[in-house]
């Protein structure tokens, strides 16, 4: 599990992208060939969790801006919302190197992404959305409480305040 020996920060030239290999070859290819260019072009912010002692990238995720139509938001979350598109952050891509699978790093990366979006003060974001790959949809639904959008059930949505409230109640329960 992630601890003080691991570091998370923006992707840079110094990170060993060539050694990264996750279970999904599309994600591996994206990280090796396109992530740095996307970061430099400001298409997406790419955050990497790495072990500086081993010169290994453990995992990464991308964040970019997006919007969701009001009508797509689950009705139970629409009270007091404006009737126009809502600003959200897209958790676009995420991967964990095969050597680190099954150790809780995927969950740690999602929590880090949610906390990063919640704490930032540069732009407003009401929620996070994700388009999960086949086989990981339940991870977002069950572990974090994401819900399907009304008009696109393949795209999942999590109100940031819901995440913070859940995190606070989990902390109090410990």
Label every model-predicted segment.
Residues 42-65, 72:
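Conserved beta-hairpin
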Residues 110, 134-136, 153-160:
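Short glycine/proline-centered loop/turn elements that form peptide/ligand docking sites
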Residues 102-115:
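Conserved acetyl-CoA-binding loop-helix of GNAT-fold acetyltransferases
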Residues 118, 123-125, 130-151:
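Conserved active-site alpha-helix within GNAT-family acetyltransferase domains
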Residues 1-41, 53-56:
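Short amphipathic alpha-helix that is part of the acyltransferase structural core
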Residues 92-102:
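A short, internal acetyl-CoA/4′-phosphopantetheine-binding micro-motif in the GNAT/acyltransferase core
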Residues 12-14, 57, 61, 132, ...:
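Catalytic cores of nucleotide-enabled group-transfer and carboxylate-activating enzymes in metabolic
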Residues 60-93:
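Conserved acyl-donor/pantetheine-binding loop and adjacent beta-alpha core of acyl/acetyltransferases
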